[in-house]
Amino acid sequence: MKKFKILLCLILVLTLVGCSSGGATSGGAVPPQKPEAGDADNNEYLELREQNFISTVADNIVNVSLDSSNAAYSNLRKLINNLQPIPTDAVNIEQMLNYFTYSYENDSEDQLKSYLEVARCPWNDENYLLSVAVKAKEFQLEENRPNNFVFLLDISGSMYAEDRLPLMIKAFKILVDNLKDNDRVSIVTYAGTESILLDGAYGSEKAKISAIISDLSAGGSTAGSKGIQRAYELAQKHYIEGGNNRVFLATDGDFNVGLSKIGDLKKFISEKRQTGVYLSLFGFGTGNLKADTMDTLAQAGNGNYYYIDSLLEAQKVFITELGGTLQTVAKDAKVQVEFNKEIVEKYRLIGYENKQLTDEEFDNSETDAGEIGAGHVTVCLIEITLKDLVDDAEIVRCTVRYKDALDNELNKEAITICNGITANPSSEFLFQSAVAEFGLILRNSKYKHNASLSKVVSRIVDNKLDSDDYRREFLQLVLKYMNDYVRR
């Protein structure tokens, strides 16, 4: 009955969309329109240059740095819900894919395990789609190492809005509620000057920590702050050998935290990660978000970048995925996909525009690649064209290489081989392809071919919708885009 009601709602919504004029009548791949509603968007994003098809004769190997960042999806969700224009570079397909949880398991002794699947490409039936999913080993919270956290919090005047400091306070109180008694917490704020509000309190002092966070108020400029230096000093002061030592930087995008040039800030953070102190970034608010800088700094600090647009998202980051958010299991994680040149004619990596590595970088154990948190699944999709299809022939070989974060062992690797095409792709493959297809439509990709919003919706409905709140929310987001953007 529940599924019947959902389908009925879909039919009604699609009927409304179908009755609209122009290119929206088919629910097809129309480019994003620009709604009049919403504030001016001064957000900044990394430039994402769409990748072209590459012949396997020229190069049959693609190397990618993996990580668990997924902030682009949260930001995209807020843009659509607020009826704001959608910049092309705001549509980061790999972060959209990596936002969701998947049912892959890792029962091996390795920290990372890969899954390969090849099936027909939904938006171009002349091609095929390869899914490379890398699953990190799960850890229970009680198995986690002790934590030493420094909260570096932006309380400048621009943080006054409800979706900035007030939401940040609620989010970090969620994190505090989940601390273990032997964890250590310090708090540094920055505005006109930096202030140390808490110096190495224990996780057992939750009431004290929460009270300090609750009392934060926004005001002043950010000139002259040395907040980032203070944060790392405290992290080093309370450093836990064998523990998880991390700075959490939360801001609406103002990075005047003591080092005026982003290059200097990146260098400083990179040097500090060598001491075992990592950095995670949390973006709040809209209109001033520097997603490009936050992505760059997170990578430099062996951490991830999250965008928190709601209390629900804060709960996802700090409760549902807490173990993965706090516990890195694989450092410098990278994947190499090698195609059989006798079978695969050409290929195109979808997303990961700024995460590709050379063969030399993949082989070099000193290459700075991504970090994967416990239980996380990182997904790469590659569209491929086949020459000939030979039964049970090797199509692709995948090598995952990383350093074990628990024992820092170098060059651990796992190899997976894919033989043949599946006629009945898994529900995970179907959902991943739906997310990617929506991304291609939003980007108005020249490779979207026959991508269709209607097909995206159908695939989601058939993909165990009732079992996952976040996938249900994604469906609602696609429908809202169809109704509020396409109909215009």
Question: For each of these PLM feature ranges, what is it?
Answer:
Residues 15-18:
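C-terminal motif of bacterial Sec signal peptides marking the signal peptidase cleavage site
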Residues 81-98, 107, 328, 338-340, ...:
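Acidic, Ser/Thr- and Gly-enriched intrinsically disordered low-complexity segments
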Residues 55-58, 62, 70-77, 331, ...:
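Long, acidic serine/threonine- and proline-rich intrinsically disordered regions
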Residues 46-128:
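Acidic/polar low-complexity segments with low predicted structural confidence
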Residues 1-6:
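Positively charged n-region of N-terminal signal peptides that target proteins for export
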Residues 20, 31, 112-332, 387-390, ...:
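Exposed acidic/Ser/Thr-rich ligand/metal-binding surfaces
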Residues 20-38:
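Short, low-complexity, disordered segments immediately C-terminal to signal peptides
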